[in-house]
Each structure stands twice: as structure tokens, then as C-alpha cells.
Amino acid sequence: MGVPDELPPGSSETDTIVSSSQPTNRSPMDLISEAESLNLRRIATNQSKAQCRPGSAAVPSHDNPPNDDLEDATLDPNSASFSLEKWLRAAVSDASQHGLSTPSGGILFRNLTVSGSGSALQLQPTVGSVLTAPLRFASLLRHRRIEPRRILHGFDGVMKTGELLLVLGRPGAGCSTFLKTVCGETNGLHIDADSVLHYNGVSQQRMMKEFKGEVVYNQEVDKHFPHLTVRQTLEFAAAARTPAHRFQNMSRDEFASYAASVVMAIFGLSHTHNTKVGNDFVRGVSGGERKRVSIAEMALAMTPFAAWDNSSRGLDSATALKFVQALRLSADLAGAAHAVAIYQASQSIYEVFDKVTVLYEGRMIFFGPTGTAKEYFERMGWVCPARQTTGDFLTSITNPLERKARAGMEDVVPKTPKDFEIYWRQSPEYKTLLGEMTEFETQHPTGNDEQASAELRARKENSQSRNSRAASPYILSIPMQIKLNTKRAYQRIWNDMSSTMSTVVGQIVIALITGSVFYDSPNTTAGFQSKGGTLFYAVLLNALTAMSEITSLYSQRPIVEKQASYAFYHPATEAIAGVVSDVPVKFLLAVAFNVIMYFLANLRREPAQFFIYFLMSFTVMFVMSAVFRTMAAVTKNAAQAMGLAGVLMLALVVYTGYVLPVPSMHPWFEWIHYLNPIYYAFEAMIANEFHGRDFDCIAFVPSYADLDGDSFSCSSLGSVAGERMVSGDSYINFNYTYTYSHVWRNFGVLLAFLIGFMAIYFLASELNSSTTSTAEALVFRRGHVPEYMRPGYTRPTDEEKAVTQSDIKPSSPSPTNTDLPLPPQRDIFTWKDISYDIEIKGEPRRLLDDVSGWVKPGTLTALMGVSGAGKTTLLDVLAHRTTMGVITGDMFVNGKGLDASFQRKTGYVQQQDLHLETATVRESLRFSALLRQPASVSIREKHDYVESVIEMLGMGDFAEAVVGTPGEGLNVEQRKLLTIGVELAAKPKLLLFLDEPTSGLDSQSSWAICTFLRKLADSGQAVLCTIHQPSAILFQEFDQLLFLAKGGKTVYFGPIGPNSRTLLDYFESNGARKCDEAENPAEYMIEVVNAEVNDRGTDWFDVWKGSKECQAVKEEIERIHEKKRGTAGAIEETDDGSTKSEFAMPFWFQLYVVTVRVFQQYWRMPEYIISKGALAIVAGLFIGFSFYDAKTSLAGLQTLVFSLFMVCALFAPLVNQIMPLFITQRSLYEVRERPSKAYSWKAFLIANILVEIPYQVLMGILTFVCYYYPVVGSSQGPDREGLVLLFCIQFYVYASTFAHMCIAAMPNAETASPIVILLFSMCLTFCGVMQPPDALPGFWIFMYRVSPFTYWVAGMATTQVHGREVVCGENELSIFDPPTNQTCGQYMERYISVAGGQVLNPSATAGCEYCSLTVADEYLAASQIYWSDRWRNFGLIWVYIGFNIFVATAVYYLFRVKKWNGRRKK
């Protein structure tokens, strides 16, 4: 949706656009750009014209705007005096008259007291602590009951319709808990019984039950379906809340489209309407635009009360201001009330709000109008420094290190949170608040909940569709919700068609491979095993394709939960829609796979049999989809669901009835096949294939010429003496105990499974859709808990955090410790005419344009710019961290070009705080120091320096805390301090780069970080730091500024000057407006540059290029180069020999340190190691006792080989366990450690491969014990047992190296998984178990020889059964009568001499019993498996392991290290 080519007649381009030169008191309409204003007018005009069309419900005249007021020309989109704001108000008024208005949002809370569960202290679990847990059972029981921690203490307040409340407080003050509580998000929280909380008189309990969606909590994370476009996302939201009576009698579809168009215009999204929303993996709109989509979606929810928890994080001040102004617009036009927590609120943002509340460690210390808050605290005795914003001042009051008392008031002002609360409750402002609350309660009495909700209910019922339940909180009826969700599901499929088609192509490839393995199976007894194998593969591959649905359902669960909380739909209706939309996709998959498979394998060429086969395949596909969807719905996380699915898959495959036929099943597990849907499908498909058919026998016993009478028998099961044909029904009865009469019974059973699992899935989706929240806590290593957190030690702590933020704030340096132990800085880094070009969609785009500058030791340089100007891009280019594009220009150190050591000698503090989750703070710092400081520095000195950094950053209290994850580990500020600390621990010799070090921090934490950077610079460090929009005070800490406009164009580089005077003089003297005394220079500058031209119409970039300041920069760069070239020789002489090397430490030291760290990581991840062990033990025991005491009959030998086949089936889950962990390690290495030249990629890869091996050896031992002794027993000698143990260990080692080979070059585990499945299934299919090598088509024989499982199965099988005597079962014997006057032995002597085997009753003259084998080796020889090859096979697997390691190394180097543009990444 672009801007119309021409305006409606009489319109002015500048209507309703307020001058941007006013720093304060902006209109809420400011957030609507000029282009979007025109767009809104076009929508209004089109709507007016739509109402004038013949046949429309209302036919007003051309000048009849939405509110039917003929006289008001400001409401006519075609009028010169058209007012956008008035038109929107009129539209809301018109909507109100038609039942479209939202209920007014008002809330009152009195004595609101909230407690949280969870310990303030957690200990890091390790493999050791988990294994020794039984020994600590009594201690665990004693500490099981944890007293609830009080988070909020007696809050009082009221918000009326159309009000905005700003919630201020430092991290841990209770802001999030407060917002969650007032919105009913109380999972893991407990509200005291004495607390009063109601919405216009309606209790929270009734609100959550009947009017969910009227009160909404918005987290800072944007959750959307990535493949939907912006318009589709917003039209869905509008359709879900479309009322029964619609604006100007539109249809539902018209209203949804119209409402989406309006909000896209209001929030500046019209240009993105056809762009995917996207996410971290799917390309879509920008992060800021995605945030606006979230805001627009919530606006369409038409909720009267909303809470926003730090939703502006990551936005610059200008974008954050637009966000808040959007809320202002929503409040003004729709009467909504919004509570917003913002960490860094500029003055402009602050002034948009009506009320503000200040929280201090769980206590409310102010609640009232924004205009009186500053005066209140100044009257209390606190001083607000000049140019500090009101928001920063109010937050600073809660930090003892930041607040300043007025002279003479130091002993009078409150000190503790409790003191502040007492002062507040005694103040006249509090009494005014109580009066306001009393007045609100008079208007909305709380005594009669039913009466208070009557108005809400009436409005809701007026909006609800015809068939909706009156008590339902949803506007749409359930059938309409299903219809809407189904439409969206098809949109998602269509927008991601490549994924669907790749799945179809994958199924076709698998069908071609599998079908060709069993190609043209003969319609004789020789085809019995091939046909059975074909149908077994067919039913399994149809059934197990649905397993991937678990991950897709988990990826969408947060979105469904969010939209259910907005009262868009029942989660169950989304689940139903997902199943419905899957029908055509699954049908396409079934056709693609089954048609190819069926005809390639030469299954029964009869129409009825083909359609029965297809019906069973399609049905079992849906049944298993329901099973896996149910698993996803009843579990709490994807790991649980996948673990459960892995165990279930093993049970389903074993008890399908093929690898372990029903007669061979043991009573303790036999019951499983009755609960196995695949069993019923397989029986039906086998019976369907073999019923009513007679198969020619191709092998007779004995195979003499001129056989007649009953003197011979077919060698196949189900044969009858003297018959040359074998009945298919007889064969399946003897081999499987299957019968054709069960076919339609089994179909009925499958339908019952389908209905049952679908019902559980829909129910679980509805009831298990909420996630619980836990209190935040620090995690420490056992034995390293700091003294202040041990029981009995008293120290003020924040109830919401494990440690208060003030406890871990980097304190101001004491007078005795002002000098930092930094290396002396002598080098100056300069860059000249840097440009950077990349190619986007085939077109070149310039991101940086002739940027020049320098960073000198002892200076703090700020890098700023408008949103999208290329700040981070410039930092990446200067730090040599770009991997694509063309860079032109020059970079120098002391006037000389950069060498290989440049990246090692610079520190780069990235915006993302990436650290190893299992390491402690001290370990993270030591790792950096050990590898990045020169080899000439001893390990002791490196450790001592780390302690200095810990003290420098004030991290002593949590130095032994584990990094962890947000919520269980370091908080945002602590992570940021650690990120800075890691770079300082490396002792950067040249300079320190920092990218947005204050992003996501509150203003006090930002101040602490910047003052620390100032301290670093004063100690001689060179610092270059990007920053969004600092406060005026914070801005003054910097020495120099490099400011970029859009396109990476320089508009200023130079000193800032006292009170920013040098900078302001430059802009004011070149045509910018005067900067107001009270204005923030940083905000002023953004505003001036955003205008793109000065008052003379000249572009600021051109102004800079023609300025004397620009010329001075070029001259200074040349002067630096000349001066430094003269002293370079002296400097180089003092450097040690390793100065110019790529890495600071030798390779073997790197490998040692990295390997130790990875070992530590594995030891501290008990869930990973225990899950590996559980898989090995549970799968080993299950297979072992399923194939327990394998007999040496023909069926017993076959089941023993199939037991090895099932052990091989563990390969895929083993590999899938390893890959995600490797991705985590690699992300940390490639994003932070490799660019810093901490250690080589070879050390990284080798360490990760090495550390897996000991655990894989352990898993092999566990599997050997659990599998071998139940199946084979302990009768074999230690040499045979030892070899089987070696094969088991080898299998696990091979799996780990195979995983590294597959994942090494792949971007993520999801991409690598299909490759793993394809390679694994190929290896398994061609290993000789399912189809002996002699039966394979000639083309595929090479795969039999290539498959590593061929040699592993052969080695295992022959070692287990070599030399064992075969004892045929009764149904395996060939029974026939010898000719007259001959015994069975005499009659069979000639045959046995050629074919082998044994006659069990040689002296009998009738009913000869012949067994085709004597020893097990003969059975294996038919598959080319020989005892003499066992050690060769063992050796060949090691060759495969070596090959895996080689390929992993090669592909990692080729695809992730080597640059293909001629340069190498080192």
C-alpha cells in the first residue's frame, strides 16, 4: 500500500502534521507520517465512496462523512479543511453507535500485596550432584518447603478511562510483577486475600473468566507467525474481534480489511503490508516494524486495559516516542488505559503520560500525576541535576549511589525503601490519591460483582456473533473461530510453499529409494520377505512423517497462547484448524509416497487392494499425527515431547509385528502391540496383499527331479506336503498369525484411535496452554556461595531478585584505587574514506559513505546516528568483523596498515551478551585472559589481572555465580558487565569497541556503564562506543562524536565540547534551529539530522563535506600518520616476537584450555548427560527384554538380527541429541571468540569431538550390559563378550563423529536433521537386514558395501551366534513322506550333501522332519556374513569414524572459515 499519486481534491499535504521543531507537547498525531496521513485519507475517501454505491445499506450524499454531520467540513476527506484526527474520532463515535465501542478501561487496586515462590539462591546442578542426590534425600526433604517471598507490599492506585500510567523502577523493583498482576497473569504468583483489585467494579476472577481479552499483558518479545504478511496478521486480529454490528454495515471481510488498513496507516506499516512479518530465521520486516505490528495487533484486540512490560527495549528514543504516542492515540480515541514500564524514558516520552508510579524494591513510593512527581521528591529533599530528565531523576531516587540530597537535608530524607513508603503514605499526594480512589469506588462499587459486570456483559453480547455462548469471553462462535483459523492455516501453508514442496520432494525421493530396493518383488515364495519388508517400510514411513509436527507445534505455542489471552479464539479451535488444513497436505504426501512405493515394489496390481492399501496408509498417517500432536500438547517443553516420542517410536517399531512377529513376543511386553496403531495398519496391509492368492514355490525339499505325491514340500512357511503352490493366507497365519477377517476390524480400531487421540489433543491444547513464571534467582556452584547469601547472614535484598541491583552496581572508585592496571596505550587507530557496499536482491547498496576519523588513547568517542544509519556496520567494518560486501578506504595503526594481530589487540563488546551458560563469571574472565593475553604473561599474572577486572567492575558479589539463562542466572545488567569484563580481561592493546553497551539497561545502569567507560579512558584506554540516544548528562561524558546520517554519511566528527557547545555551535552556525537550554543535545541533533536538510535546503552530508571541520579531520589524520611513522621503529623494537601473530597462545595450549572448558560444560549439563544415559539404558533394556533369550530357531536367528537392526535405529536420536549442543557452542565461538582471535577453529572442532568420546564410551558400556545379557546370556566366553562390548562402544563413537560431520557446516540443527535422516535411512536400508545383498537390484549393491551398518551388524551378529546349533521350531520344519521302502535319512542323504541342513527323524519311514540349517553360521552366510570377517569389520568402522572427522574438518573449513572471494578468514 503506497502513497496515492495525487491527493483528494482540496487536500493539503501538511494537514494535521505538527511541526517537528517543537521539542515538547507534541500532538499524538505526530507519529503518523505525511505519507500515511495521505493513505488514511485515501481509505476514508474510499469508504465514503463505498457508502454511496447503489445497493449499499446506507446511501449518504458525497459530503456525508462517517458521523452523518453534513455541516462539518473537517470530516469530509475531500474538503480542504479535512482533519484526520477529527475524522478518526468521528469514526470511533459512529462505531460506538453501532455497538463497536470498547468498554472503558479503569482499574483500582488497594493494599495490593503479592508473593512469589522460588528460592533466592540456587545451586548449579552437575552430573555428580544428580547421581548423588539419593544420598542427600533427607536434606532435600527438609529444604523442600520454601517460604514465599513477598514481592509487592501494599500498593494503592487508580487508573481511569483514557489514562496512561508510566511505571518506573530499577530492574528488580517489582515493575514486571505489578504489570502481570493487574493483568491477571498470576502463574507462580500469589495475591494476598486482603488485596482489592477490580476493573470498574468487576473482580479480577470474573474478568479473567468472562472478559478475558479486556485486560491484556504484553511482553517485550514479539511473537508472530513469521510466514504471514503484515496485512494477513492484522486482518486476522481484526476478524477475530469483529463485532456483530459493524461500522457502516460492512461485511465481516470488509471490516477486517478496513480495520487492518487503518491501523497500518496509523502505525506506519502500509508500505510493509505485503511483506512477511519474519523472525530471527525468516526474512521479514525490521525489528522496529515488527514491534509496531505487535502494537497494531493489540490495538485491533480493542482491549480497554493493557500493560506493556519494557516493550520499547531495543528501540531508539525516537521510535520509543512513536510507540508511546501510539498508545496515547489509542487512549484518546478509544478510551483505553495503558500501564507502561520503560527503563529509559526521555523527557518527551515522560510528558506523554498522565500518571507515574515509582517502585523501590517492591514498595510503591509515589503514584500520581506526572506533573507533580518531580516537585514531590524535590520537596522531600532531593536535588534534580540540570538537564536530567524527570524519568531519570525519579528512578535515581531508588538508587542510594545516584540520588543527591539537598544541602542540610542529608539526615532528614528517607533512606530505606520502607522509609520512602512511610513518607509517601503521610504525604498530601497520597491523601489526594485516596480521595480519587474513593470517588472511583463510588462510581464503580465493588459490593455487587454481578451488577458491575452487567454493562461489560451487555456490550460483549452486543458484539458477539449469533451462536456464541453468553458466558464466553470470545466474540466469535466456535465454528467461526475454526473457519478463521483454518483460513490462516492455509495462508501459512501457501506463504511457505517451499517447505511443503520440499517435504513432498523428500517423500518422493525416499519412495524411489525404498521402492527400488524392493523393486519388482516376484509373485512367488521368493518374494515373501520382500513384500513383508516393503509393507513394513511403507507403514512406518507413512506413520513417522508426523514426528516433525512436535517441533512445529512448539514453535507456534507462544503465539497461540498470546492470541488466546487477547480472546481471539479458543486454543482448541486453532488445533482443529491445524488438523483440517493438514488434510490436503497429508493427502499430497500420501499420494506422492504410496503410489511410487506400491508400483515400484510390484505389490498387488488390483484396484480394490490398492485402494485398501492407500486407505490404511492415509489413516495411519493421521492417527500417528494425532499421537504426536497429543504429545506436544500434554508436555511443557519440546525436549520432553521429543524424548517421549523417541521412546514411543522404538516401542511402536518393535511391536508392529514384523521385526518381532506376534508368536515371538514375550508376555511382559506383548500387551504393547494391542495399543499400537501401526500394528493394526500393518496387519491389514499384509492381509490385503496376501489374501486369496496362491504363490508358486521356487524351492522344494528335496529338489529332486520327477517328484510326486507327498514326497516333497515347499521350503516356505505355510506349505503343504505335495503342493507346488503356497497359500498367502496360510503363510501370513504361520508367520505372523494374521488373518484377512481382521482388515475392516483394524480399520475401525484405527478410527477409534484417531477420534480418541484427537479428542485428547484438542482438550490438552485448551487446558495446557499457559506457561508458568518463576522468580528470578542467581545460581552458584556448590561450595562457592558468597557469604552474604548463606543462611543466617542478614543484608538488604530485593524480593524479586536474588541479589539487589544496588548490591552489584559497579561502585564509584575509592580514593585509594583510582588507577586501573591497564597496559600503557601508545597506538592511534585511524581510518580514511571508508565505504562499504553490499548487494541486496541483485542491486548494490551503499551502507557507509566516505567515513573518516580516529580514536586516540585516553579519549572516549561516541558513535551515533539516526535509526538505520549504519552505526553497528561501521563498528563491524573497523573491527574487521564483516563477512560479505566490498570495503574501500584505508585503516591504519600509527600510520601503517593492519597486520594479522589487529583483531586480537582490540576488544569488541557486542550488543548481544553471548556467554557460555554453564561457566561462572570468574571462569569466563579467566578463559579470555588465558587465551588472549600474550604468552609472555604468566598464568598467575593473568589470574591476578582477572581479579583486578572483577574489582574494577564491582562484580565481586557474583564472581562465582553461573552465567545461566535470563531468569535463572545473571540479569541484564550483570550480563552486560560480564561482556565488558571479558574484553577488558584480554588487555586490548589498541582500543575497545562497544556496540550499544546501554541497550536494555535502566538509566542508572547506563550511567554506571558510561562513567566506567569514562574512567577507562582517563586511565589511557582508547574507546569507541555506539549509543542510541543518551541523556544530556550521559552525553557529556564523551570527548568526541562521530555522527552518521542515513546511508552511512558523516554529518559530524569532532569534539563535543563543554555543555556540548562545540557540537551545537557547528549545527546552529550551519542552518539548524537554536537548541533550547532545557533540551537534550543528543535528541536535538537526531531531530535536526532527521530533517535531512538545513534551513537553506542543503543536505547535512554536503554541509559536512564542505565545512572547515571536515578539512581539519583530514589534515589531523595526515599529521598523526607522519608523526607516528617517525616513532614506529622505536615502538617495534620493544615488542616481543609474538606481537604480530594471529593468536596470542600456541595451538596446544589453546586446545588444552578449550577442551577443559568443554569438559566442564558437559559435567554441568546433567540433563544432557542423563538424557543420553536414559536413552542408552531404557532402549537397551527394552530391546534386550523384547528379544529376550533369542532362540537358535530360524525365527530366533531372524529376530536376533532384527534386534541389531533396532539398536541401529537408536542412531538418529543419538545424533539429534548432539547437534543442538554443538550449534550452541559454535554460535558463541563464531560470533564472539573467533573474531577476537581467542583460539583457532581447529582447537574448537577437536575439543568438541574429543569431549563427546568418554561419554559415548560410557553409553556403549551401558547399552552392552542392558542389551547383550538379556538377548544372548552369559554363556559365551570373555573374548566374544569383549568384542561385542567394543562394537557397542564403537557404535556410539561413530554416532558422535557422524553428528559432527553432518552439523559442522549447517546453519542449524533443523537444517541438518533432514540430511541426517536421509543418510541414516539409506545406511539402515542397505545394511543387508531388510533385503539380503543377493536380493538387491544390481544398481544398489554399491550402497550395501558403502553402508557402515553393513559391517557393524555383520560383526555383532557373527560374534553373538557363531557356532551355535540351530533347532528349528515346529512351524519351520518341512514335513513330507519318503518313497516306499526308504527311510527319511536315506531319502534325504543326497540332498543334504548338496544343500545342507538336517533330518530330525532319519530312521522314520513317514512324516520326515527336515530343518534347513545345522549351525547359525549357515543362516548368516546367506547374507554374506562370516565369522572370519569380524575383526576386519571392527577395523572398517574405525575407518568410517576417521572419515567422519576428516569430512567434519574439511566442510567446516570450506564453508565456515575459508572466504571464497580470494581472502581468508583466519
UniProtKB/Swiss-Prot annotation:
Chief localisation class: membrane
Glycosylation sites: 46, 111, 249, 310, 523, 735, 768, 1381
Name of the featured protein: ABC multidrug transporter atrA
A GO CC term attached to the entry: plasma membrane
SUPFAM superfamilies xrefs: P-loop containing nucleoside triphosphate hydrolases (SSF52540)
GO MF term (any one): ATP hydrolysis activity
CDD domains: ABCG_PDR_domain1 (cd03233), ABCG_PDR_domain2 (cd03232)
Species the sequence originates in: Emericella nidulans (strain FGSC A4 / ATCC 38163 / CBS 112.46 / NRRL 194 / M139)
Stretches for region Disordered: 1-30, 47-76, 441-469, 789-822
Annotated ABC transporter domain residues: 135-386, 829-1071
Membrane topology, record value: Multi-pass membrane protein
Membership in a protein family: Belongs to the ABC transporter superfamily. ABCG family. PDR (TC 3.A.1.205) subfamily.
Compartments reported by the entry: Cell membrane
Purpose of the protein: Pleiotropic ABC efflux transporter involved in the basal level of drugs susceptibility, including antibiotics, azole fungicides and plant defense toxins.
UniProt binding sites for ATP: 865-872
Transmembrane segments: 499-519, 533-553, 583-603, 608-628, 642-662, 747-767, 1168-1188, 1195-1215, 1244-1264, 1283-1303, 1312-1332, 1434-1454
Bias (Polar residues): 11-27, 803-819
Inducers of expression: Expression is strongly increased by imazalil. Expression is also strongly increased in the presence of hygromycin and 4-nitroquinoline oxide (4-NQO). Curiously, expression is repressed in the presence of camptothecin, imazalil and itraconazole.
Keywords, comma-separated and alphabetical: ATP-binding, Cell membrane, Glycoprotein, Membrane, Nucleotide-binding, Repeat, Transmembrane, Transmembrane helix, Transport
